[in-house]
Regions:
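Bacterial N-terminal signal peptides that target proteins for export
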Residues: 1-9
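Bacterial N-terminal signal peptides
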Residues: 9-18
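His/Glu-rich zincin catalytic helix
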Residues: 20-144, 171-198
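Catalytic zinc-binding patch centered on the HExxH motif and its immediate surroundings
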Residues: 42, 53, 156-166
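Short, glycine-/polar-rich solvent-exposed loops and beta-turns at beta-strand/coil boundaries
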Residues: 56, 77, 164-166, 200, ...
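Alpha-helix-centered segments that form part of catalytic cores
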Residues: 141-157
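Short, glycine/charge-rich beta-strand/loop segments that flank catalytic centers
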Residues: 167-170, 201-210
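Short acidic/His-enriched helical or mixed secondary-structure segments at domain edges of catalytic enzymes
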Residues: 206-225
Length: 225
């Protein structure tokens, strides 16, 4: 509930800034000589909201920045932050599933099997456990609805749906019509409060593929040096 309130407050502030940026009743900070005239609001719950006004089009560019990135990865599971970024697009209890009550026991079983797999050292036993994980994952996938988050964003007119993981941040990006900010806020509140981890295997393959593609990027090599 607290996170829901955070996002609703964020939505209200953004809407207020678009409608009456010059008469905001909220206290804010600013940076001297900032050409964008950004306003920095700190809500009672500690959430920081950065806002600038662009009246060229009736749209709002949104960034939800989380203070976690590659530097927070455990030594034995590097890439975890990037992997989780991908899993944030897999839905919640409300969307991304045909029947969450039927899906949940299988997702719980997958999580338990992975924990056993992690603690098992015998290679033959690990292979047997992983085979079981594959089987349960396949059954769970029958209840999942692929790309439903993207479809929800498209339905409200959003473009540029994306995310990226850096050294100390993970950022989720949308470009939305200004009259859809309430719907955007409700979806994001549900997404961040009730995210369901599903589609483990397929998304892991996607992350591996992105990593393989980056191995030939000179810019990426410099960044990771």
């Amino acid at each position: 509930m607290r996170k829901t309130i955070q996002f609703l407050q964020l939505a209200f502030l953004l809407l207020l800034a678009t409608a009456c940026a010059e008469t905001s009743p909220f206290k804010y900070e600013s940076v001297p000589n900032d050409p964008l005239k950004a306003r920095i609001y700190t809500l009672d719950n500690g959430l920081k909201v950065y806002m600038t006004v662009n009246k060229e089009t009736p749209r709002i560019q949104t960034y939800i920045a989380v203070r976690v990135g590659g530097k927070n990865d455990p030594a034995e599971t590097t890439g975890l932050a990037h992997y989780f970024e991908h899993l944030m697009f897999k839905g919640t209890q409300q969307f991304g599933t045909q029947n969450y009550e039927q899906e949940k026991p299988m997702l719980d079983q997958i999580e338990q099997l992975f924990e056993v797999y992690r603690k098992t050292t015998d290679e033959a036993e690990r292979q047997a456990i992983y085979h079981q994980i594959d089987s349960v994952s396949y059954e769970a996938s029958k209840l999942a609805i692929p790309n439903e988050y993207d479809k929800l964003m498209s339905a409200i007119g959003a473009t540029g749906t994306n995310a990226y993981t850096g050294f100390d941040q993970t950022v989720y990006v949308e470009d939305i019509p200004s009259n859809q900010i309430d719907n955007w806020a409700k979806i994001q509140a549900d997404r961040f409060e009730n995210n369901v981890i599903r589609g483990f295997h397929t998304e892991l393959e996607t992350v591996y593929e992105e990593k393989n593609m980056s191995l030939t990027s000179d810019g990426r090599k410099v960044y990771e040096a």
